Amino acid sequence: MKLLLLALIQFYRRWISPLTPASCRFYPTCSQYGLEAIDRFGPLKGSWLTLCRILRCHPFHPGGYDPVPPLPSCSCGKSPCD
């Protein structure tokens, strides 16, 4: 499922996005955000984060720098988490 979602985003970036004017208000772009979110959090949570990001990408939002959130850190003080 993860690979399918990543492939769909890559297809969009390669074949559809060049046909439309640049309109993403954020950095990284929404498609790059989607790739990173799905890769970092998996298909379910990554897709949810991407959908929320796309819904924020409209002319009435100021946009700006909006990175994918980091993975939760371990509260035990050890790295990596056990």
From Swiss-Prot:
InterPro entries: Membr_insert_effic_factor_YidD. The keyword Cell membrane applies. Signal peptide: none annotated. GO terms for cellular component: plasma membrane. It is found in: Cell inner membrane. The keyword Membrane applies. Belongs to the UPF0161 family. Could be involved in insertion of integral membrane proteins into the membrane. HAMAP family: UPF0161_YidD. This is Putative membrane protein insertion efficiency factor. It comes from Synechococcus elongatus (strain ATCC 33912 / PCC 7942 / FACHB-805) (Anacystis nidulans R2).
